[in-house]
């Protein structure tokens, strides 16, 4: 059965950049590259906001990627640790670790689903990604559209409900949220 995923919102553009071509995009705006049987024209990017992961962990040419991250006017990074992308950022927004927030984890191809209870208060001014993006959305007058009027626990409950419904349709019986969360 399919586990819940956060809504990605409506794409206002019909183009995308393969993550493996981020350096090309930043270093060669306007260039055309082949991708998946199509030609993709790389846009000019003035701002990069990187949250969730570290591109330096999986890029083929770290020196080239490092040079690429120096090109945009502004680089913002949300992260729990001061990793290489943070060193190249103009703004680093400290994000909570999995120990400092409530969450739940599920294996993509197996049956494992586990609650992840917050074990410690966030260090210094760290905030979870949801709160960081909700604060930014608020500055643009879009908080309600972004949060759908849910906080961290509201989203956890909502995502559990979707997953539980999907499981039921697949012939599996998952417990009510209260039982799962305890």
Question: Would you name each region that the model predicts?
Answer:
Residues 40, 111-112, 137, 141:
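Glycine-centered secondary-structure boundary/capping sites
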Residues 41, 62, 113, 125-133:
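Generic structural signal for well-ordered, non-membrane alpha-helical segments
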Residues 1-12, 119-182:
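N-terminal leader/propeptide and maturation segments of large enzyme subunits in energy/redox metabolism
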